[in-house]
């Protein structure tokens, strides 16, 4: 009997996100500093002939039909490029909220590609993995090797991994899903200045940041251009941000991706834990997770 293979699917967090403009194909070019949390989903694979997917966990009810799941889409994209690909039974433990700005579906798809690579003796840098990732979804490529990077284009242009200081953080979602397409459609170019020198595209600046304090200082000069249109769609995001800004020890609070999850950065794990405890008492229906970003 084939033994199970297991991969974690860590949450993706956009520490910065600038929208550079809309392309002729309707998509938007962005630049974003992306890091990964130590919380996420868990995906296992029992190698076999048939491709199947079962989902359990707190977020299972929000994942939709199996045929629409990015795990299945990624597996099929790779099967179209690798002759006689060995697939099997995927089991997804869905811990992250869906449509939440954490790239959880993309992280799951990337984990599926890593599992299939292991099951079929494909090298981690096999170009067919990255082609399948690109065709599966905009964020899948950056999740394939989950390390800090600058992401550009629609997500397909990636920098080399960055050795950034790790950050103590709180992730908070108010229990609402915000459709990415609607958030982008609400973005107004006139309200967003062009990126300045030292922005998220300046790899030299990021490479020279030596410690957590200087990274936090640098991040304060950055933005998420999708925050305003997301708040216009779902005012609960503003409530989350206000609560995070008001937490003792919060250095920075910002929305991740297209929302609705927001993050707050703290100088210590103790401050993060205290903020989490207080917010859970005030807002028991919110999804709240203490984490380390890196």
Residue ranges and their predicted role:
Residues 145, 150-252, 267-270, 277-280, ...:
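Conserved, helical-rich catalytic subdomain that frames metal- and/or nucleotide-binding sites
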Residues 1-100, 118-123, 127, 164, ...:
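ATP-binding N-lobe of GHMP and related small-molecule kinases
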Residues 17, 41-45, 139-143, 149, ...:
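Short beta-strand scaffold segments in enzyme catalytic cores
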Residues 15, 43-45, 71, 105, ...:
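Residue-level signal for inorganic ion chemistry
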Residues 70, 108, 236:
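Charged catalytic carboxylate motif
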Residues 109-150, 157:
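Contiguous, small/hydrophobic- and glycine-enriched helical/loop subdomains that border
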Residues 49-62, 112, 134, 212-223, ...:
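Short, basic/glycine-rich phosphate-binding loops at helix/coil junctions
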Residues 91-120, 137-138, 249-266:
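Glycine/serine-rich anion-binding loops at beta->alpha junctions
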